[in-house]
Amino acid sequence: MSNPKRKILVTCALPYANGAIHLGHMLEHIQADIWVRFQRMRGNEIHFVCADDAHGTPIMLNADKLGITPEQLIEKAKADHIADFAGFNISFDNYHSTHSEENREYTSAIYKKLKANGFIKSKVISQLFDPEKNMFLPDRFVKGTCPKCKAEDQYGDNCEVCASTYSPMDLINPRSVVSGSTPVVKQSEHFFFDLPSFEEMLKAWTRSGSLQPEIANKVQEWFESGLQQWDISRDAPYFGFEIPDSENKFFYVWLDAPIGYMASFKNLCDRTGLNFDDFWKKESDAELYHFIGKDIVYFHSLFWPAMLEGSEYRKPTNVFAHGYVTVDGQKMSKSRGTFIQASTYLKHIDPECLRYYYAAKLNDRIEDLDFNLEDFVQRVNSDIVNKLVNLASRTAGFITKRFEGKLASTLENQALFDEFVAQSEQIATYFETREYNKAIREIMALTDKANKYIDDKAPWVIAKEEGTDAELQAVCSMGLELFRVLMSYLKPVLPKLAERAEAFLQTELRWDNIGSPLFAHSIAPFKSLFSRLEKKQIDAVIEETKALFAESVKAETAKKGKEMTACETKVEPIAPEITIDDFAKLDLRVAKVLKCEAVPKSDKLLRFELDLGDHTRQVFSGIKAAYSQPEELEGRFVIMIANLAPRKMSFGMSEGMILSAGTGGADLYLLSADSGVTAGMQVR
């Protein structure tokens, strides 16, 4: 008896309609698309929607700067985004915009329901106001001198030089980024969503398995620090939706953005006849999944489910978060040419190369993925060209030339074929649980076995012998049967290569017929299925990216030069002399950061879990001001004093000291080791 068909709705986080799609965005959309395509192959009813996040002050101001309307700006962005996603074969059923009538309707309805249920509060707040532009200023649209280190040209919420945080009203000599005028303080009534009212519901939901363990643990920290009322309103002028029954008040972009998931699906329903309530009503038995980046976990794990609960809609089945993309072990960089836009990549490289590389490294955890350019070329050529496609290319010619394109009527090696088919459920499980790296590893292991079979049988030798036609046909047909199975497994990852393979094999690649051989089946003449990836293609992408951002990099470099002058680091005097025997008492070791997190209720401490090769240790380090995203340190190698006596702290036992350079506070830099080191190595 077959399993009942599942009803699934999948979304990706909404790209902001004020910039281009880059390879960081593509990680999420490729991850989701592979999962969606796999579910389609399994016969499930699945719908895949997304939209542009099209509201907010940045869009309004950028449009004004360009001399166009916000509507014109977001329409251009939407067209560009759709083209980029299509270029990477992202198979959305609908791509919409939050600036739509559907989103206006649902945003207003949800707000009214929350208000009717007592979850909307109001209070008067003080804000900086631009008297020339006649507008209240968000924190990032105010600049001035840092009240702590006196660095100039700093934003209204934090200093990029000393990392201090503060109120925009604490800035020295504040000015409006919009007009250059000196802002004044004005009061305004704002509306707040009563998030604390949902704490017990959220605690139960976050512990129900609806979040990855890493997210659930992080949410627990937020509970411990206390949930706050959430300001959901902004004052005019603002590009967005007006709040019902209010004057010159607009919904904050983060209120209507997730509702955009519902609006995009409603737009799809209206076009196709799908039933919206089947997927969104409170008692819906459909599955709802959000694929997001780790930077927006707070909104999707707290505000969004609380909004849905308070307005009597269903909550997500699960929220799948992923890490960031690094390039060659470092953050994407405009100056190094690694902040690669999707459109730049598509000019030079087959999108399936990136789909495969991301899949080969993606798992179900919130880990950053390193896009190593040298490994990228090697892996694509080794796995896809040399192994997978080569399996077909060195057998198909014999079938076409010697047997008029017809495959054999029996399997030459039934046991080997059965072994390949038997892996279908394990590979399916890996795709289902988003452990794509394990699926790829399993598929490539089978590919190696298939190539070994051909190597051992050597059809090119058989072809030269008299009276061996039946054997030659059987061996080559067997190789192509194994190729068909492998391409079926890889179809969610490499959809365009799968299309070409289907045209060549003259059959549809389906999950439910993997175990059905193509006996006495006619195939088309073999044509090249995939081209080698060359280093010169990578170089072209890097150089074009550098040229694209040359002016902005130049301006940023000049700005950083000013900041360094404003906050000159004093060189401390050399400490008193010690002997070699004194130094020898220190046992310095290389340690790998397994986990790094902020210590709740501490302004300074980070908790490290360190791998020293043969054991792990916990170390607390007062470098929080210098590393505001502690999870980004995970996977790095650091230097520690391993024989320092353990110190009991209120948060736990600290078993060593991590070394860093700098004057303290935000001016601290972890010492790291050169490539090639391993955890536990002694520093000499």
From Swiss-Prot:
Upper classification of the organism: Bacteria, Pseudomonadati, Pseudomonadota, Gammaproteobacteria, Pasteurellales
Protein name: Methionine--tRNA ligase
Entry's localization field: Cytoplasm
Source organism of this protein record: Glaesserella parasuis serovar 5 (strain SH0165)
Subunit: Homodimer.
Entry keyword set: Aminoacyl-tRNA synthetase, ATP-binding, Cytoplasm, Ligase, Metal-binding, Nucleotide-binding, Protein biosynthesis, RNA-binding, tRNA-binding, Zinc
Domain tRNA-binding: 582-684
Sequence motif: 'HIGH' region, positions: 15-25
PROSITE patterns xref list: AA_TRNA_LIGASE_I (PS00178), TRBD (PS50886)
GO terms assigned for molecular function: ATP binding; metal ion binding; methionine-tRNA ligase activity; tRNA binding
